[in-house]
Design a protein with these regions (language model features):
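Active-site and NAD+-binding cores of ADP-ribose-processing enzymes
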Residues: 1-39, 44-73, 97-185
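Conserved structured core elements
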Residues: 83-87, 159
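A short, exposed loop/beta-hairpin motif centered on an aromatic-Gly-Thr core
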Residues: 76-82
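Short active-site loop/helix that positions an aromatic residue
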Residues: 86-97
Length: 185
């Protein structure tokens, strides 16, 4: 929880904030942070609708009062989870009976695209050790947020690490500005 001092170039001497900042800087350097022009179609499935024609509001994020904990957000902090195709949206909700809606973006978005993380260099690569560690972290984070979410009454503390990283990414100011979203898959 603190900087031990020592060599500023040693990853072991970084604070947690320093490590996350370095990973965010690497993501930007690798062009994982990208601008998305307006017109992107995002799909969202909602299970068990009783209405025959739901409204756009029905497909938005849930109200704070009923927002459950997910891989990237704690309970009470709503986030919009969208998919790039209807099939993925339906798979996300894991319900046989669901309706799918879509949104078309009208403004440019700044996105962190975790689907484009380069492979981790091999152990005998001449790439710096820190690059291997940070790329490994990005891959683990991407894998973690894609895991199924349990829908039960338990408190899922195992979601806290990915929620903390997500909150850091939401608040971090990249060279192009703050992020609007994360792409994974």
């Amino acid at each position: 929880f603190h900087d031990k001092g020592g060599d500023d170039k040693s990853a072991e001497s970084f604070s947690s904030l320093g490590i996350l900042t370095a990973i965010a800087d690497l993501a930007e350097h690798l062009d994982l942070v990208r601008n998305q022009e307006p017109g992107l179609r995002l799909y969202r499935a909602r299970p068990g609708f009783k209405k025959s024609s739901p409204s756009a509001k029905d497909f938005g994020p849930p109200p704070r009062t009923v927002c459950q904990s997910n891989r990237m957000n704690p309970a009470g902090v709503p986030m919009f989870y969208g998919a790039l195709d209807p099939r993925t949206a339906v798979k996300e909700v894991k319900e046989q009976s669901s309706q799918v809606g879509f949104f078309i973006t009208v403004e440019p978005l700044r996105l962190l695209d975790l689907s484009r993380i380069p492979a981790v260099p091999g152990f005998f690569s001449e790439e710096p050790r820190r690059l291997r560690l940070y790329l490994s972290f990005l891959h683990y984070f991407a894998d973690d947020i894609m895991q199924p979410v349990a829908r039960d009454d338990r408190v899922h503390t195992e979601y806290v690490p990915s929620q903390v990283v997500t909150e850091f990414l939401r608040e971090h100011t990249f060279e192009v500005g703050k992020l609007d979203g994360v792409v994974y898959g």
